[in-house]
């Protein structure tokens, strides 16, 4: 019955598309996307209403489809968790396809692009619904193949073809690891035990289990851009903007997390095995934040931001909870696709210019909606109150407060550093897109500072960072650490070693040197952070961050006070609304 209604909707959409968009090639594609989007919205609304009425147990279902091709079984499963992810990915795909019509309208090979685009999304859906090793491997291979076609779509450009092959060959590393892991599991369990949920790990040797899980994690790292295997993602930005919005926001970068979610139930037995990922995730977080600060290419900027977000999602999936990590990349795909589309519009307007420092005249292009979408995406990434990012990170911190195990301090430290770094590099992007013109033009500085949306967003982010830093100082340091975990500190003081003391001395020397040059946070990078020396410096680093932020806000308050006095004396009789606006700024900073 559902297929009959779906075919009816497709026929109706094709007829209506012919009348609405004209009898041309785009009629079929636009009508098909519209109908699929309507059906997805109906299904998603039905699921949300069902959850509100019957609770989350409504998602506890599992539909299995088994296909027999000459004794070769292909098994697909549809559960509530994977159906929810698939609906979100397809909704993002529909939005990106509408933008792709605008972006690729004058391309001679638009039909080929749309066909590859659709096949890529179908392969992603097949990979999400896969239930055994063969279907998962087929979906994994097809995703790598068609991602190469999309990244190197402008094959006549040398760098597009080169970076497409680079992404393809790095993906082949993951394919080899996946084949090895599946071969070990097949040989140890028997060829009849092929599904993910019926692996007979009790019949396997412990070293085989450990080695196969290590191979699966390494395979997931190739797609989810962890440290050492992340080099393909910034270079893959040579493809079209719709390809970057789909691959780097919603599909290819989350394949590793989805692969690990298939066998997540067996990770509980080796939880301590992933303890080293704490230092690994922090290393790539600091490294990619530094790359963001020293990179002025817009597309590469978003790529490095994607690496930070996906690496933290992988860390949450492996070390905390699979559903928290999945929630992170679900909200990430929406705001990151929005960010790609908005930046793609500005790249079109500025004739292919991608240098972030040259966007200071964006206010004269008239893209009001694009500016509002950019502000909304940045505020969502910064986790401003009552947005999706705020609820995700609040749920993460609440879960960490409820948990109690020996490495909770490291988890809290990574979460706090991730939140702070996210706000810092998003403020960096906001500064270059909205404030750089005010800094470099000294003719009429007061006029340029009277931009309501920019100043309001700046005040909101600054106030949020100040309150968040105060919250971390009071709650985590004074209450959480010294009250709830005094036993942990006494245990650590009894069992410290010489290597921790050596790292402490090195850190003090580096801190003094960086503080002398005034670049403590932008140049801080030490490979020894893998060794988890956070226990000693947790309180010190938070206090330093708090003092720096307090000094920064004090300077900003004095500057705005001087601007307010100057504006009040000079422009009072002409622009009363500007005086009122600076009164609001003064109240916020006080």
UniProtKB/Swiss-Prot annotation:
First-level EC class: translocase
InterPro entries: ND/Mrp_TM, NU5C-like
Chemical reaction(s) catalysed: a ubiquinone + NADH + 5 H(+)(in) = a ubiquinol + NAD(+) + 4 H(+)(out)
MF-aspect GO terms: NADH dehydrogenase (ubiquinone) activity
Subcellular location: Mitochondrion inner membrane
Keyword presence, NAD: yes
GO biological process: one example: ATP synthesis coupled electron transport
Translocase among keywords: yes
Residue intervals passing through the bilayer: 1-21, 28-48, 58-78, 81-101, 113-133, 136-156, 176-198, 245-265, 273-293, 310-330, 333-353, 372-392, 395-415, 428-450, 461-481, 501-521, 536-556, 568-588
Listed EC numbers: 7.1.1.2
UniProt entry keywords in alphabetical sequence: Electron transport, Membrane, Mitochondrion, Mitochondrion inner membrane, NAD, Respiratory chain, Translocase, Transmembrane, Transmembrane helix, Transport, Ubiquinone
Topological type in the membrane: Multi-pass membrane protein
GO (cellular component) term, any one: mitochondrial inner membrane
Functional description taken from the UniProt entry: Core subunit of the mitochondrial membrane respiratory chain NADH dehydrogenase (Complex I) that is believed to belong to the minimal assembly required for catalysis. Complex I functions in the transfer of electrons from NADH to the respiratory chain. The immediate electron acceptor for the enzyme is believed to be ubiquinone.
Family: Belongs to the complex I subunit 5 family.
Protein name: NADH-ubiquinone oxidoreductase chain 5
């Amino acid at each position: 019955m559902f297929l009959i209604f779906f075919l009816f909707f497709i026929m109706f959409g094709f007829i209506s598309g012919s009348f609405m968009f004209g009898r041309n090639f785009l009629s079929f594609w636009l009508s098909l996307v519209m109908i699929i989007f309507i059906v997805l919205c109906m299904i998603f609304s039905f699921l949300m209403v069902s959850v509100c009425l019957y609770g989350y147990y409504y998602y506890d279902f599992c539909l299995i489809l088994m296909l027999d091709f000459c004794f070769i079984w292909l098994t697909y499963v549809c559960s509530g968790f994977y159906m929810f992810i698939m609906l979100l990915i397809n909704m993002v795909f529909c939005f990106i396809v509408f933008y792709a019509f605008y972006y690729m309208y004058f391309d001679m090979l638009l039909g080929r692009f749309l066909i590859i685009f659709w096949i890529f999304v179908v392969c992603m859906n097949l990979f999400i619904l896969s239930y055994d090793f063969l279907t998962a491997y087929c979906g994994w291979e097809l995703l790598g193949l068609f991602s190469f076609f999309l990244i190197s779509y402008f094959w006549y450009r040398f760098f597009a073809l080169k970076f497409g092959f680079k992404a393809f060959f790095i993906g082949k590393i993951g394919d080899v690891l996946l084949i090895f892991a599946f071969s070990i599991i097949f040989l140890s369990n028997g060829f009849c035990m092929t599904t993910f949920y019926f692996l007979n790990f009790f019949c396997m040797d412990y070293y085989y289990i450990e080695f196969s899980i290590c191979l699966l994690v390494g395979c997931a790292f190739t797609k989810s851009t962890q440290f050492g295997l992340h080099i393909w993602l910034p270079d893959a930005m040579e493809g079209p903007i719709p390809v970057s919005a789909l691959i780097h926001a919603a599909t290819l970068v989350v394949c590793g997390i989805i692969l690990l979610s298939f066998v997540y139930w067996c990770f509980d037995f080796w939880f301590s095995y992933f303890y080293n990922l704490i230092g690994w995730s922090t290393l790539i977080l600091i490294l990619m934040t530094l790359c963001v600060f020293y990179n002025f290419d817009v597309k590469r900027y978003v790529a490095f931001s994607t690496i930070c977000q996906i690496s933290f999602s992988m860390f949450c999936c492996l070390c905390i909870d699979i559903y928290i990590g999945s929630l992170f990349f679900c909200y990430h795909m929406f705001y990151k696709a929005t960010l790609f589309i908005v930046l793609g519009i500005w790249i079109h307007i500025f004739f292919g210019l991608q240098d972030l420092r040259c966007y200071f005249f964006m206010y004269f292009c008239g893209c009001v909606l694009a500016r509002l979408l950019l502000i909304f995406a940045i505020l969502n990434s910064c986790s401003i109150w009552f947005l999706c990012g705020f609820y995700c990170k609040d749920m993460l911190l609440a879960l960490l407060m409820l948990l109690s195990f020996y490495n909770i301090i490291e988890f809290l430290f990574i979460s706090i550093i991730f939140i702070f770094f996210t706000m810092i590099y998003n403020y960096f992007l906001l500064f270059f897109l909205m404030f750089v013109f005010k800094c470099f033009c000294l003719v009429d500085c007061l006029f340029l500072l009277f931009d309501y949306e920019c100043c309001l967003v700046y005040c909101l982010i600054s106030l949020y960072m100040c309150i968040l830093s105060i919250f971390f100082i009071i709650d985590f340091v004074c209450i959480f650490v010294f009250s709830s975990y005094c036993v942990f500190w006494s245990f650590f003081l009894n069992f410290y070693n010489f290597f921790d003391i050596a790292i402490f001395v090195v850190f003090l020397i580096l801190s003094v040197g960086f503080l002398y040059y005034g670049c403590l946070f932008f140049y801080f990078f030490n490979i020894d952070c893998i060794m988890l020396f956070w226990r000693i410096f947790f309180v010190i680093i938070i206090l330093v961050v708090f003092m720096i932020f307090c000094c920064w806000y004090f300077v900003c308050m004095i500057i705005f006070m001087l601007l307010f006095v100057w504006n009040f004396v000079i422009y009072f009789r002409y622009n009363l609304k500007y005086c009122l606006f600076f009164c609001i700024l003064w109240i916020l900073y006080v």
